[in-house]
Amino acid sequence: MSVPPLLRPPSPLLPAAAAVAAAAAALVPGSGPAPFPAPGAAPAGGISFHLQIGLSREPVLLLQDSSGDYSLAHVREMACSIVDQKFPECGFYGLYDKILLFRHDPASDNILQLVKIASDIQEGDLIEVVLSASATFEDFQIRPHALFVHSYRAPAFCDHCGEMLWGLVRQGLKCEGCGLNYHKRCAFKIPNNCSGVRRRRLSNVSLTGLGTVRTASAEFSTSVPDEPLLSPVSPGFEQKSPSESFIGREKRSNSQSYIGRPIQLDKLLMSKVKVPHTFVIHSYTRPTVCQFCKKLLKGLFRQGLQCKDCRFNCHKRCAPKVPNNCLGEVTINGELLSPGAESDVVMEEGSDDNDSERNSGLMDDMDEAMVQDTEMALAEGQSGGAEMQDPDADQEDSNRTISPSTSNNIPLMRVVQSVKHTKRRSSTVMKEGWMVHYTSKDTLRKRHYWRLDSKCITLFQNDTGSRYYKEIPLSEILCLEPAKPSALTPVGATPHCFEITTANVVYYVGENVVNPSSSPPNNSVLPSGIGPDVARMWEVAIQHALMPVIPKGSSVGSGSNSHKDISVSISVSNCQIQENVDISTVYQIFPDEVLGSGQFGIVYGGKHRKTGRDVAIKIIDKLRFPTKQESQLRNEVAILQNLHHPGVVNLECMFETPERVFVVMEKLHGDMLEMILSSEKGRLPEHITKFLITQILVALRHLHFKNIVHCDLKPENVLLASADPFPQVKLCDFGFARIIGEKSFRRSVVGTPAYLAPEVLRNKGYNRSLDMWSVGVIIYVSLSGTFPFNEDEDIHDQIQNAAFMYPPNPWKEISHEAIDLINNLLQVKMRKRYSVDKTLSHPWLQDYQTWLDLRELECRIGERYITHESDDSRWEQYAGEQGLQYPAHLISLSASHSDSPEAEEREMKALSERVSIL
C-alpha cells in the first residue's frame, strides 16, 4: 500500500519551517495522516482547504502521496477524525463509509457540488461534510467500549451484572469512553453502547493550534484497517494514540485491552422485539447493586428482584420504573450472554498484561492505575514500525496462557487493615477575629486580628494583610486558665478574661468591660475583640486546638474542671505513675500531621511543650473495642516498656483517659515501604536491601531473646531514623506482639495477611518462626516490588513453581544467593524455616561492603549494636586477601573498644542472646 498523503491544518509558523516539516513527515516510512500542517505556503503539489462540519470549520492541507496522486479516502479519514474529536457523542460505528463530501460553489445554482474524486477539490475550497442517508438508527446505537484493566481503591460494582468487583488490585475493566466498570467475565457480554462522555470536549474549540498533540499522533498512526486489532472504539478513536485525547495521561499502547461482544450481534439484537421484564424475588450471595438506581441491594436474603430472562437486578421499589427493554435470553454459540451467567469466556486481549516492572507511584492516579512491563513495552515498540501482524495470529497469541517470564503477582502497596483515615487539610483556620491582650513583660494592651489554626495563634496587624505581629505556637502553651488577680493589671484598668502561659511569657487576653450591673453607655456597641462573650469563645476554641483529637460527644471547657474530666493518669516507661496529668499540658498534638494508621489507632505528629522535641503519638479509641480486648490495647505499651534496644522504637510515656489511650513514642523520618515505592524502579538494589534486612534481623534477635514475637512484621512497621541513603531502622507497632517461649505455640489471630505465614492463615499453632516468614516476604518485596504470591492460587503450589515465583523480570538481575535465602525463609514447614542467626550467617548477608556500611552507621550514631568485635579481624583479613582497602578509622576504633570493660560486657550479652536463641 502506498504511503498516504499528509493532511495538516495550517499553523502560524514560518514558511521555511513548513517545508522542513513537510519533507520530514513525508520521509517517515509508513506514516499515516499527520493532522497538523507545516505552516505558511503550501508545499509543491499540496492543496489547502477548509472542512466544515455543522457550525465548525477546520483548515486542512492535502499533500500528494508518493505516486503523485491525491486520495479522497484520506479526506474522509480526516473528516472522521475531526468528528471524533470535536463531536465524540455524535460519532458511531462505520462513520467512514456513511459520510458525503460537498464542495461549496457560489457560482452554481446548486451551491453544494458532490465531491466524487480528489481532483474536484481546489485550492481554498470549502468542503461540507454531510451524513449519508444510509446511516441507520442502529449505527448510532453501536458504539464499542474501550476496556482496560483497572485497579480500584474503593468498592466498585459491575455495571453489567451489578455484582461487586472482588480483589486487591486489577479487580475489573474500566471503559475509557464512558467510565463504566465491568468484570472481565462480563466483557464479552456487554452491549456496544459506550456513551463516550469522558472523551467529550467543547465543539466550538478549534483543533488548530494543538500541533503538539496532532503531530505526535502522526508518529503512531499507520494505515488502520477497518477492524482494529485492539479494542474496537469508534472510528476516530482507533486512528489516534491515547495521548491525543488525554493530554498528560499515561499512554495505554501497551496496556491490556479487552474486546466486547461482536458488533454483528448488536445489529442482530437491534431487530429483536423488546418486551417487559419478568421479575422474580431473588436471594443474592454476593454484594449486588440495583441496575436501575445504582444503590446496594441490602439484606441477607430476598434482597431484590431479578428478571428470569435477562438477569436484570433491581429493588422491588424500582421494578415499576424499569423500561420494557428485555431481550430475553441472548445466546451465541450456545453461551448465555445474560448478566447473571457465570460462564468463563476466553477474552481477546490486545496485548499481554505485563506488570512485573512496577511503577513506584502505584494507583496515585485512579484513572490511570495500570502498570506496564518496560522490557515488553520496548519490544512491542520496536515491532510497531514493522508491517501489521495478521489479526488472526494476534488473536491466537492473545488466548495463550500467561507466560512465566512475566509476574502476575500483586504489586507492592500499603496495606491498611482499619477504617480509612483521610489526612486533614493542614493549617486550617479554626477561628479568626479581633482580640486584645497584654503580657507579663508589657502591660500596654494591644489589639490585633487573631487567627487560630491547628499549629499556632497568629496575631496579624489587620484582617486583610499578611503582616503579623507575633506567632504563639500551640506546642509552647503550657497552661490555659481563667483570669486571676494580677499585680500587673494597671490601677483602674478593666480586667482580662483568661491567661495563656508559655515558658517565657504570660499573655493576658481579653477585656471584661461589661459588668452584670451595668450596660454600655447610650446602648453603644462594644469594639470588636472586647467583652467577656468574645473572650469566652476564644478560650474554648484555643482549648479545642490544644487537645484537637477528643472523643465524640465529650465537651471541652477551660480551667481545672476540664482537666479533671479528661485526665486520669500517665504511665512513664520507668513504670512511675502520676495522677491527674492532662496530655495537652505536656504535648501538643497536630491533627493535620497523620503519620500512619492501623487496626488499633492513628499516629499523629506532636511536640513536647517545654523542650520542643518532636514525637509521634498513637491514639487508641477504647470505645471501638469490646471490654475483652482492652488488655490487648495495652499489649504494645507493656512490651515496649521492657524493651530498650537501638533497633526498636523508643516509648516515652503513656496517657490514658476513660475513652482513649495515648502512646507517646520517638518520631522518625518515614518507613521502609515509602523508601521502596519512591525508589526509581519501585524496588531496592541488593546492597541497600542487605543493609536494611541485617538491622531488622538484629532487632528481631533481641526480641526473640526476650521471648517476644512481633507477629506483624512488614515494611510499614520498619521505620527510618533519617532520610539518608543508608538509614538506621527501628521496628515499631507491637500491637500484635506476643510473648512466646522457645518451644511454645500460640493460636490467636495476628498480623497482616499479605505478610503472614501459612500456619497462621490456616489457624494452626505458630511460634517465633512466624517473624522469619515475614522477613522472607520483606526481602522479596524489597527486591522485586511485588508480593511473592498470587491471591488466586495456593501458596504451597506457588512456592513449588520457581518459574512463577521468580520470573526473569526482574529476578534475572538478582543474585542466586538472595533467591536461596528467600527460599529458606518461605518454608511452609516451620522446622525447615531459617532462624535469625542462621539467616544472619547466610552468604548473601555475609558481605564485606554491607559490613562496612553497617560499621559506618554505628560510627555515625555512636553505638555498636549491629556488628560484633569478633568479626573485625576476619573482615580485615578478607580485605587484605582481596586487595581491598580497609578503613583506617575502623582499625583504631576496634582496638580501643576491645580494651574497654563495656565492650566485654556487651560481648558476653550478645553471646548469651545467640546461645539462648540457638
UniProtKB/Swiss-Prot annotation:
Annotated PH domain residues: 428-547
Main location: cytoplasm
Protein kinase domain boundaries: 589-845
One GO molecular-function entry: zinc ion binding
Subcellular location: Cytoplasm; Cell membrane; Golgi apparatus, trans-Golgi network
Residue list for modification Phosphoserine: S203, S206, S217, S221, S351, S403, S407, S454, S554, S744, S748, S916
Activity regulation comment: Activated by DAG and phorbol esters. Phorbol-ester/DAG-type domain 1 binds DAG with high affinity and appears to play the dominant role in mediating translocation to the cell membrane and trans-Golgi network. Phorbol-ester/DAG-type domain 2 binds phorbol ester with higher affinity. Autophosphorylation of Ser-748 and phosphorylation of Ser-744 by PKC relieves auto-inhibition by the PH domain. Phosphorylation on Tyr-469 by the SRC-ABL1 pathway in response to oxidative stress, is also required for activation. Activated by DAPK1 under oxidative stress.
Effect on the protein of changing S744A: Loss of basal kinase activity and phorbol ester-stimulated kinase activity
EC primary class: transferase
Free-text description of this protein's post-translational modifications in UniProt: Phosphorylated at Ser-403 and Ser-407 by MAPK13 during regulation of insulin secretion in pancreatic beta cells. Phosphorylated by DAPK1. Phosphorylated at Tyr-93 and by ABL at Tyr-469, which primes the kinase in response to oxidative stress, and promotes a second step activating phosphorylation at Ser-744/Ser-748 by PKRD. Phosphorylated at Ser-916 upon S.enterica infection in macrophages.
Gene: Prkd1
Subunit structure of this chain's protein: Interacts (via N-terminus) with ADAP1/CENTA1. Interacts with MAPK13. Interacts with DAPK1 in an oxidative stress-regulated manner. Interacts with USP28; the interaction induces phosphorylation of USP28 and activated KRAS-mediated stabilization of ZNF304. Interacts with AKAP13 (via C-terminal domain).
Protein name in UniProt: Serine/threonine-protein kinase D1
Skewed-composition ranges (Acidic residues): 345-355
Catalysed reactions, semicolon-separated: L-seryl-[protein] + ATP = O-phospho-L-seryl-[protein] + ADP + H(+); L-threonyl-[protein] + ATP = O-phospho-L-threonyl-[protein] + ADP + H(+)
Gene3D superfamilies, per the entry: 3.30.60.20, Pleckstrin-homology domain (PH domain)/Phosphotyrosine-binding domain (PTB) (2.30.29.30), Transferase(Phosphotransferase) domain 1 (1.10.510.10)
Consequence of substituting S744D: High basal kinase activity, loss of phorbol ester-stimulated kinase activity
Described function: Serine/threonine-protein kinase that converts transient diacylglycerol (DAG) signals into prolonged physiological effects downstream of PKC, and is involved in the regulation of MAPK8/JNK1 and Ras signaling, Golgi membrane integrity and trafficking, cell survival through NF-kappa-B activation, cell migration, cell differentiation by mediating HDAC7 nuclear export, cell proliferation via MAPK1/3 (ERK1/2) signaling, and plays a role in cardiac hypertrophy, VEGFA-induced angiogenesis, genotoxic-induced apoptosis and flagellin-stimulated inflammatory response.
Post-translational modification Phosphotyrosine, affected residues: Y93, Y438, Y469, Y508, Y755
Residues annotated to bind ATP: L595, G596, S597, G598, Q599, F600, G601, I602, V603, K618
Residues at the active site: D712 (proton acceptor)
Cofactor(s) recorded in Swiss-Prot or TrEMBL: Mg(2+)
Database matches in InterPro entries: C1-like_sf, DAG/PE-bd, Kinase-like_dom_sf, PE/DAG-bd, PH-like_dom_sf, PH_domain, Prot_kinase_dom, Protein_kinase_ATP_BS
Keyword Flavoprotein tagged: no
